Amino acid sequence: MGWTDSLPAGSAEQVSALLDRATEFDGKAPVSEQGRHAVAGRGAARHFVELDGDTVVGYAQLQAGSDEHPDMAELVVDPQARRRGIGTRLAAAVFDEGRPGTRVWAHGNVDAAVEFAKSLDLVSVRELLQLRRPLDAPQLPEIVVPEGVTMRTYRGPEDDSEILRVNNAAFSWHPEQGGWTQAEIDERTAEGWFDPAGLFMAFADTDPDTLLGFHWTKVHAPEGDDPELGEVYVVGIDPAAQGRGLGRVLTLAGMHYLRDRGLGTVLLYVEGDNTAALHTYERLGFDRFHVDMAYARAL
């Protein structure tokens, strides 16, 4: 099966089952949340399926980039079909289909992924860190809202336009988080994990209709050896409101909410080269848990 813009229902079910098997076997998901949405037909992507007879044994997904951002790919091989050259064929298909500079994610960047990248003469070009922190100890700092700022939680679709404005201004540089449309908000508010009480928003007292920043939390269902986990899902600050401590206070508001829901651990993702954010999160007690690495062909 060659590249396709959408998966037939039967293939999508097989790919989803393959992702589940690989997640259970490896202890980590081989594709992102965005990738899962695309498999289910809720996001634009190109799909490539490797078959053994009628059985899906390999899968690659290619997300188109832009003039500023490269194409991004994810791939997975059935745990029972590895070391047969399937991964090499999937990677070749990705680099043949993608634009120059296409990148492939290695979620967890385990030794096998590092060796696989070396065998294809790929180089690491982007590092995404997952940080974690227990919510019970050390004690969370108190929430101190800056003077002249009001915080509240999500009220519904009436808030969406401001969330989109701030998100896209704050993440204009980001290949996945930037460029959101209403569809991205609708997908997430329709998810079973969404709780409007866990989406925190900050406004100036003098301008209560203009959003300064937001923190969208998420709760992950138990998976593998992991219990239910909280996540600092998105923290977005309007560039015009930077430097007022809003990122810290919004992050803490979400962490207090997750703790009060009875969760024991919170996670977040941050770019490996974002030293300012890393410093902020480390001061809040976060430690590095694992690394996702993106690889590309050497120039």
UniProtKB/Swiss-Prot annotation:
Spell out the Gene3D superfamilies in the cross-references: 3.40.630.30
Q: Which PROSITE patterns match?
A: GNAT
Instruction: Cite the EC number.
Output: 2.3.1.189
Q: Which UniProt keywords are listed?
A: Acyltransferase, Repeat, Transferase
One GO MF term on file is: protein-N-terminal-alanine acetyltransferase activity
Residues given in the record as 1D-myo-inositol 2-(L-cysteinylamino)-2-deoxy-alpha-D-glucopyranoside binding sites = E33, E176, K218, E231, Y269
The keyword Acyltransferase appears for this protein: yes
Q: Does the keyword Acyltransferase apply?
A: yes
A Pfam family that the UniProt record links to this protein: Acetyltransf_1
Q: Which residues bind acetyl-CoA 2?
A: 235-237, 242-248, 274-279
Its recorded reaction(s) are: 1D-myo-inositol 2-(L-cysteinylamino)-2-deoxy-alpha-D-glucopyranoside + acetyl-CoA = mycothiol + CoA + H(+)
Which enzyme type, at the first EC level? transferase
Task: List ligand-binding residues for acetyl-CoA 1.
Answer: L75, V76, V77, R83, R84, G85, I86, G87, T88
What is known about its subunit structure?
Monomer.
Q: What does this protein do?
A: Catalyzes the transfer of acetyl from acetyl-CoA to desacetylmycothiol (Cys-GlcN-Ins) to form mycothiol.
Family annotation (NCBIfam families):
mycothiol_MshD
Q: What is this protein called?
A: Mycothiol acetyltransferase
Record organism:
Rhodococcus erythropolis (strain PR4 / NBRC 100887)
Gene designation = mshD
